[in-house]
Amino acid sequence: MTRLEKIYTDKVAPALNKEFGYKSSMEIPGIKAISLNIGLGEASQNAKLIDGAVEELTAIAGQRAVVTRAKKSIAAFKLREGMPVGSRVTLRRDLMWDFLDKLISFALPRVRDFRGIPDKGFDGRGNFTLGIKELTIFPEIQLDKIEITKGMNVTIVTSAKTDKEGKMLLELLGMPFKK
């Protein structure tokens, strides 16, 4: 059991149950998965960028990332169907808890002028999406190997039914939201 998972079972779940008064312990919101995504529009001209994105995402996540490909051809973007356009990985169980712990404890405090995460990333069903502008905030990324600075989307999928439940779950886990 990871550190953050232990915090969830010992402190967060009882606090959520007390706040919202669930009838069953299975109703208590939890984190189901974390999805990481890098979209690279420049990859249509330079295919080597995709390899770097896959390697960086694999290093950050601890799980092999897959290449995402264009579903349709778009002439304005010089894009053909099947061309690589990004990279993604979905984390579950222990890797998910390890990544969330690393994000909250190490990566977010390394963001320049960090004042907290805006809570506008909730989707209405308790899931939270956060954009990261630079991957260099993660300790696994080696600065000398980076060709271009890339950003990433992090989606935290929860079993919460409302944004209020999802926000409280993440706050109790230590996610630094803006006050």
Swiss-Prot record:
GO MF terms on file?
rRNA binding; structural constituent of ribosome; tRNA binding
| GO BP of this protein | translation
Which segments of the protein form a coiled coil according to its record? none
For this protein, the parts annotated as crossing the membrane are none
**InterPro entries, sorted:** Ribosomal_uL5, Ribosomal_uL5_bac-type, Ribosomal_uL5_C, Ribosomal_uL5_CS, Ribosomal_uL5_dom_sf, Ribosomal_uL5_N
- Which keywords describe this protein according to UniProt? Ribonucleoprotein, Ribosomal protein, RNA-binding, rRNA-binding, tRNA-binding
Q: Could you state one GO cellular component term attached to this entry? A: ribosome
**Ribosomal protein as a keyword?**
yes
Q: Which Pfam families match?
A: Ribosomal_L5 (PF00281), Ribosomal_L5_C (PF00673)
Q: What does the annotation say about its assembly with partners?
A: Part of the 50S ribosomal subunit; part of the 5S rRNA/L5/L18/L25 subcomplex. Contacts the 5S rRNA and the P site tRNA. Forms a bridge to the 30S subunit in the 70S ribosome.
Which family, according to UniProt?
Answer: Belongs to the universal ribosomal protein uL5 family.
List the HAMAP family hit by this protein, alphabetically. Ribosomal_uL5_B
Q: What does this protein do?
A: This is one of the proteins that bind and probably mediate the attachment of the 5S RNA into the large ribosomal subunit, where it forms part of the central protuberance. In the 70S ribosome it contacts protein S13 of the 30S subunit (bridge B1b), connecting the 2 subunits; this bridge is implicated in subunit movement. Contacts the P site tRNA; the 5S rRNA and some of its associated proteins might help stabilize positioning of ribosome-bound tRNAs.
Protein name, as recorded: Large ribosomal subunit protein uL5
Q: Which organism is it from?
A: Maridesulfovibrio salexigens (strain ATCC 14822 / DSM 2638 / NCIMB 8403 / VKM B-1763) (Desulfovibrio salexigens)
